[in-house]
């Protein structure tokens, strides 16, 4: 998705629901294109291939969380999702004019509260299928060096076998699916809100804890004190669970495969992919991995 195609879709979506796209700010463009309108509304334009079913589920999840008085992003009260120009778009209340991330203790509190909820059967949340996501990314390996691609394919198969043998410690249930500090922002009053509901599903709760642990332990993006507070508030340290290295490696591989999709048009991304694959191959430091 280019900025040009995203903006064209934005204009059409706004016309459909009666909003004004003038002055819209492009917040980011990646898996989705995200715009903030002059009216406090966020428009998320889905990537190629995103289904109406998945977008409907995001909106339904948001409305369920609102009914539970759970602090999460709120779906705009319009007929949505909107399917136009081959993209599925959703519209959300804008919680703030800037993206300010919540402290880790508040991230842990929202994850803990989420895990205390029981989703109604009507939501029809899917069971997490982590390797289906990796399989979607596999074609992008054709964009990297042949030896690197072969190594990553073999590593994924090894990881698949290790994952199937895991014995999870926590009771399964509803999970965010991509819980980390980047998906908990502060609203205008400084209260934390859970955002990006597109990975909501059911499954082992460890999935919602592993990224914070990974960002602390391998990337040093969080301090020891921040991680201690996270564990204290949630009540479980996923790093003490024997399966942690498997989920951590899964996340590293997923982050790297996602970046492969950008490697053709962006030499910086291509260099980062090579660096990451070498670190995975050799067990090298991840502390120089650049965020994308």
Where do the protein language model's features map onto the residues?
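Regulatory N- and C-terminal appendages and interdomain linkers associated
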Residues: 1-21, 150, 275-292
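An alpha-helical support segment within catalytic cores of ATP-dependent transferases
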Residues: 2-10, 119-177, 235
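A conserved alpha-helical element in kinase catalytic cores
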Residues: 7, 44-85, 97-116
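ATP-binding glycine-rich phosphate-binding loop
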Residues: 16-37
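A conserved loop-to-beta-strand element in the N-lobe of protein kinase catalytic cores
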Residues: 84-92
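Active-site activation/catalytic loop segments of kinase-like enzymes and analogous catalytic loops
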Residues: 206-236, 250-265
């Amino acid at each position: 998705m280019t900025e040009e195609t995203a903006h064209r879709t934005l204009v059409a979506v706004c016309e459909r629901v009666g909003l004004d796209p003038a002055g819209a700010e492009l917040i980011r463009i990646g898996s989705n294109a995200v715009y903030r309108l002059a009216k406090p509304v966020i428009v998320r334009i889905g990537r190629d291939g995103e289904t109406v079913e998945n977008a409907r589920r995001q909106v339904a999840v948001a409305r369920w969380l609102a009914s539970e008085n759970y602090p999460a992003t709120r779906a705009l009260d319009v007929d949505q999702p909107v399917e136009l120009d081959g993209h599925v778009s959703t519209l959300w209340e804008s919680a703030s004019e800037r993206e300010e991330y919540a402290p880790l203790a508040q991230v842990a509190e929202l994850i803990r509260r989420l895990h205390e909820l029981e989703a109604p059967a009507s939501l029809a949340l899917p069971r997490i299928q982590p390797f289906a996501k990796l399989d979607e990314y596999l074609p992008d390996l054709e964009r990297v060096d042949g030896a690197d691609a072969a190594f990553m394919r073999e590593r994924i198969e090894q990881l698949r076998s290790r994952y199937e043998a895991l014995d999870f410690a926590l009771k399964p249930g509803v999970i965010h699916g991509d819980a980390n500090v980047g998906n908990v922002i502060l609203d205008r009053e400084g209260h934390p809100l859970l955002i990006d509901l597109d990975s909501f599903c059911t499954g082992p709760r460890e999935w919602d804890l592993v990224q914070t642990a990974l960002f602390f332990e391998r990337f040093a993006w969080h301090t020891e004190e921040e991680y201690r507070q996270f564990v204290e508030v949630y009540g479980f340290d996923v790093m003490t669970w024997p399966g942690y290295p498997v989920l951590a490696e899964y996340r590293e591989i997923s982050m790297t495969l996602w970046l492969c999709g950008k490697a053709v048009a962006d030499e910086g991304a291509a260099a980062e992919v090579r660096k990451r694959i070498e670190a995975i191959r050799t067990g090298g430091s991840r502390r120089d991995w650049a965020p994308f």
